[in-house]
């Protein structure tokens, strides 16, 4: 016990010295990961022996120490092979060789000089994600010994680096658009240049490619006009219209007259509830409502997201479901919103984007 405590104390003192030194030499970064590796091994052994506290220090769980130790070994070996190359004389800081940087895309590579790239999905400024284009990427060769230094580049398809003659994309805009968007459209902004989604550029438009060094080929500044010939014109990326004209009646399905690509194919509106709009109750004290139906977690997130639109509805219920109804499952919930008028409800539906996984039914409710 005393031997473990003493060795752990010496190891952590050495780590503090390295942090205070804040060196930019590769050998110091290798020493740092050796100390992390030893610290994890000592903590693992102490926990394995049944100790939960060592030197007034709570010991992490066995799985935590083991996982962190494996990562320390991985980084130590990578830096030791880098030390045998010409890149060992370059300045290397703790930040350059930290685990978070190592795990950032592209994973398993050393990276420096990052530049932020903004990607806007579906033309909505509030649906923007940020990615990093690296000025320097160091990746290991196939033999596991040598290293190659490249810079990352960006085009309409994603962010990549060159491995010999092949593009290795570590950010695929199409996959990201399917994850964060609904219409498969995206716009990339970096500095003064804009790169549009391939689906919105004509076949005569030349491919855009920008390197992290600041050089660009066929780039289009944000305030410039696309090049055209006499017969073909480049089509700019136009976001889907925010306003959809919906027509509700007792004998006609709701439809969109301004969305040619069928963006609402997955959204169902019940006609049975729409018929209630024309029904008069004896009390006359009724309010327009919308039932939003979907998976409970999705509905919870949706209810939180619409808080910024409080001026467009009166009240929102918690998630509920029908009881004693055949076919009803607790995996499908309902959130009900009330409105002061039909006009307010229509304004809400025009303004707020409803996720395609949520269906809705319109109606009225007596208060």
Curated annotation (Swiss-Prot):
Signal peptide span: none
A GO CC annotation given for this chain: host cell nucleus
Primary location group: host cell
InterPro entries: E2/EBNA1_C_sf (IPR035975), Nucleotide-bd_a/b_plait_sf (IPR012677), Papillomavirus_E2_C (IPR000427), PPV_E2_N (IPR001866), Reg_prot_E2 (IPR033668), Regulatory_protein_E2_N (IPR036050), Regulatory_protein_E2_N_1 (IPR042503), Regulatory_protein_E2_N_2 (IPR042504)
Gene Ontology terms: biological process: DNA replication; DNA-templated transcription; regulation of DNA replication; viral DNA genome replication
Post-translational note: Phosphorylated. Sumoylation plays a regulatory role in E2 transcriptional activity.
Record's compositionally biased regions (Polar residues): 207-233, 249-259, 275-286
Disordered: annotated span: 207-291
Location of the region described as Transactivation domain in the Swiss-Prot/TrEMBL record: 1-202
Subcellular location: Host nucleus
Covalent cross-link Glycyl lysine isopeptide (Lys-Gly) (interchain with G-Cter in SUMO), where: 293
Region DNA-binding domain, annotated ranges: 286-367
Keywords: Activator, DNA replication, DNA-binding, Early protein, Host nucleus, Isopeptide bond, Phosphoprotein, Repressor, Transcription, Transcription regulation, Ubl conjugation
Assembly mode: Binds DNA as homodimer. Interacts with protein E1; this interaction greatly increases E1 DNA-binding activity. Interacts with protein L1; this interaction enhances E2-dependent replication and transcription activation. Interacts with protein L2; this interaction inhibits E2 transcriptional activity but not DNA replication function E2. Interacts with protein E7; this interaction inhibits E7 oncogenic activity. Interacts with host TAF1; this interaction modulates E2-dependent transcriptional regulation. Interacts with host BRD4; this interaction mediates E2 transcriptional activation function.
Stated name of the protein: Regulatory protein E2
Gene: E2
């Amino acid at each position: 016990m005393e031997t473990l405590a003493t060795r752990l104390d010496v190891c952590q003192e050495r780590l503090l010295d390295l942090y205070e030194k804040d060196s930019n030499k590769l050998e110091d970064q290798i020493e740092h990961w050796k100390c992390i590796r030893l610290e994890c091994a000592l903590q693992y052994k102490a926990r394995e022996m049944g100790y939960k506290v060592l030197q007034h220090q709570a010991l992490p769980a066995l799985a935590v120490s083991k996982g962190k130790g494996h990562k320390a070994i991985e980084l130590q070996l990578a830096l030791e092979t880098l030390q045998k190359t010409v890149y060992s004389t370059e300045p290397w800081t703790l930040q350059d060789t930290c685990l978070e940087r190592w795990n950032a895309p592209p994973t398993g590579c050393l990276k420096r000089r990052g530049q932020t790239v903004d990607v806007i999905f579906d033309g909505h400024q509030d649906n923007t994600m940020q990615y990093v284009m690296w000025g320097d990427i160091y990746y290991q060769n196939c033999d596991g010994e040598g290293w190659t230094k490249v810079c990352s580049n960006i085009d309409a398809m994603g962010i990549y680096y060159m491995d010999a003659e092949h593009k290795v994309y570590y950010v695929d805009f199409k996959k990201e658009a399917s994850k964060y968007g609904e219409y498969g459209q995206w716009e990339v902004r970096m500095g003064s240049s804009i790169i549009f989604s391939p689906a919105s550029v004509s076949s005569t438009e030349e491919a855009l490619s920008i390197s992290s060094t600041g050089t660009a080929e066929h780039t289009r500044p944000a305030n410039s006009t696309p090049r055209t010939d006499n017969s073909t014109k480049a089509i700019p990326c136009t976001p889907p219209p925010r306003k959809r004209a919906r027509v509700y009646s007792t004998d006609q399905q709701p439809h969109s007259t301004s969305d040619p690509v069928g963006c609402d194919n997955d959204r169902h509106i019940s006609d049975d509830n729409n018929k209630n709009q024309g029904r008069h109750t004896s009390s006359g004290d009724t309010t327009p409502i919308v039932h939003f139906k979907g998976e409970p977690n999705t509905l919870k997130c949706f209810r939180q997201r619409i808080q910024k639109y409080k001026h467009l509805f009166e009240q929102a219920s918690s998630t509920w479901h029908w009881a004693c109804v055949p076919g009803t499952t607790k995996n499908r919930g309902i959130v009900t919103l009330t409105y002061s008028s039909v006009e307010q409800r229509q304004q809400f539906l025009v303004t707020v984007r409803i996720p395609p996984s949520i269906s809705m039914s319109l109606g009225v409710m007596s208060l």
